[in-house]
Amino acid sequence: MIKTLKRIPLVFLIAIMACSNSGDNGKDKVEEQEQAQEQGEKKGQGEERDKEDGIDGLQPTFLADQDPKPDDKKWIKVEGVSDEFNDSELDLTKWSPTPEFIWNGQDRGWYGGSRSLFEADNVSVGNGFLRIEGEKFDSPKYSPKDNTDTPPQRRYGGAYVYGKTLAEPGYYIEARMRASKTAMSAAFWLKTETKPCGENLNDGENLEIDIQECVGVFTGELGDEWTKDDWAVNANWDRIFHYNTHRHNSPCNNIGDRQTKGGKANFDKKNSDEFHIYAAYWHADGSKIDFYIDGELEKSITPVIPFKGALRLIMSSNFYDWIEETSAEDMGFNRPLEDRYTQFDWVRVWQLEDL
């Protein structure tokens, strides 16, 4: 910035100094220039990362012959649920950094697994990334909804960031993301709003689309029944592309056990070692969801029922209930802060329009 001022002609500087309140105005001007430069540098960082990956950011990420767009349509970005994270703070007009969700005077938010606590303090934006810190507390904590008559059990801190604008059927939803180097999860997903079943937008159904869920460090599992199969236990949870559609039990459907259809693929490297672009094309009629990795179709899923209603878009980091607890060192919680971040480079959501 000093070099920039040196380039300004001396006569011009004298004229500025002669003006009333010139000191304050000059300071304000310099601060504005510094802020603009900082934002430009951050934007440049994101653009440079996109260039390295061969992405222009003006269209969804697809490899050759992978774009499902019909010839008479074009992709348009849905700005309300898209973000490059190039500002210095989270855009609170788009995102909530806390799971708190007050409906009819009741907090219907979900604050994490039984050993985890979602806290807004673990959410930050910097260097062109949305960052969710994973931490091990010095002592267990309560969530705002816990029964304080029993000892607290929440020992690990993460966060839950959700979009204030709901995602709709017909959207192509993608994020460039990397897991932390801890046992915390890294997840990009959609879920029915936590309203009473008769008041949500899914005809009372409690639906979920997991575009990606993994962990940064896999320490083993506790032996819950659902993890006692080859699909889960031996899935290499710290080097996985893991996607699902869930139809959960609710008072309105009484289906009993959750109904799930999904799949997985494994990477050569760990989820914490490299960024990937995780995406899903949610067909407009809700009958099918196509899951993509780095612009390539991995699998098309037909949910057990059509997913026809709008869902909440979520970025989160949780300590899964089925993960085995080992030492803080082994689980990565003694690592430097930068290693304990789950990072989202950007989130981009698209819809089709007529040409």
Swiss-Prot record:
Does the record bear NADP in its keywords?
Answer: no
Stretches the record annotates as Disordered:
22-72
- Identify where the record puts lipid attachment of type N-palmitoyl cysteine: 19
The UniProt record lists the EC number as: 3.2.1.178
Any single Gene Ontology cellular-component annotation: cell outer membrane
Q: What is its main location?
A: membrane
Q: Which family does it belong to?
A: Belongs to the glycosyl hydrolase 16 family.
What name is this protein filed under? Beta-porphyranase C
Its source organism is Zobellia galactanivorans (strain DSM 12802 / CCUG 47099 / CIP 106680 / NCIMB 13871 / Dsij)
* The encoding gene: porC
